[in-house]
């Protein structure tokens, strides 16, 4: 015999919507849940809206079951009083779900990383400067492999001196990607025709003395969540394998304007999670039986293997830091609101950030200079200067370090303590600091989970989530479904607590300009992604098996110049970033 809900034609998606409206999850009796589940895929054609249905009736018993999740015990009288309101609200929820909302539409509520009363932020009125490429004495390498591993800062002078051509570099990048991608699975699609056209144009312009930027003529790769007309933008998912977008991502437009040459769209973990996509698992060039980590998997792997001088990745929670660590490249996660996300897949509107992944901190600065700043299309972007030059000094910088994280037992402790000695050898006076720990920072992850579930809500409700690559407990399909049970009040409260966290972090960082931190030490990765602070992650040694470890430098809001200056000085003293994976050297 069907249950009352099943008898009213409740399908799985409507049922999830009903329960989430109540904040109902595990408290629901298992039999009721099982009875409500239809056969997957039987009643829905992808992309075709569902026919209107009469909303199911919420009963006092359902409210009673929901109280465990919402944390609010009620009396019978209170439940009876609520019933009409809750049922009326459910009708509205169903109406909202019938509206098709593209992934590119931002919520009306916008995150601002600058807390009230924040001090010493760069003045918007200051003149923005463009970095000079600098004079790096470089001769043309004798082998193609040596040429492939040169940095952006080294390639620029060679191009301008016409000791190498953009067409040669572009063909070298394409050849290496074709050769090594079967081992690395880092490429989704090559943009060969576009790249060769751009390279020929760059060579003509350079020969005439028209130098657009330090990136002119240099090949690069885009994480495949950036829209490029004429090529699929797959988001790493079989569901979007053929997706063609007409718009051009702002970072692509800006790198085009800088004269850089786009040669490939690079792998990302499906919907920007991990290193597994519909083509397989992207590999770490230092250990090819190991994943590259993610979700900026392809950008890290392709750069580390000498297939590309640089790439653009993204970070919501570790997606630049983690693969940069695993693959031994240098990554810059900018301040939230520094780089326009127009034309980029949205995962979390209040946490997504785009940034460069390169061979060095200097290269990150050269790329960041080309892509930062407002475009009138992403309303979260600030107009703030980036006053930085290659080989900027660190005189006068106040350097802090996360004392507790360095002293705690963790796998890279020996490397991290050695980093303290290097920093002291640079003549810096280190100030011990601690990020706040009194707030439930881990619980704030529901902000990311809820926003991600909203970004891909149609996939969950249509039942197409069973076509996604991974179906594990921590993979997106299950996370998206689970997020339906996050109460709206808790989501708002989490954001209010986030504001409290932002104020506390701002108070701590007023005492310093840059903070050294173990890349995954303590709660710094989650905390600074929630607050929107910038970070550079760079190689800091190698494990016995030859795989890299990393170190992070955290900055104040809009403090990328200071972070890059310290990172550049550190790399000048260590040179870990110059090592090459032996199989690709």
Where do the protein language model's features map onto the residues?
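N-terminal secretory signal peptides
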Residues: 1-10
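N-terminal export leaders
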Residues: 10-31
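Gly/Ser-rich catalytic/binding loops embedded in alpha/beta enzyme cores
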Residues: 74-317, 335, 421, 427
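A short helix-breaking turn/cap at a secondary-structure junction
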Residues: 132-138, 333-417, 466, 573-585
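Glycine-rich, small-residue loops and helix-cap segments
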Residues: 162, 217, 223, 257, ...
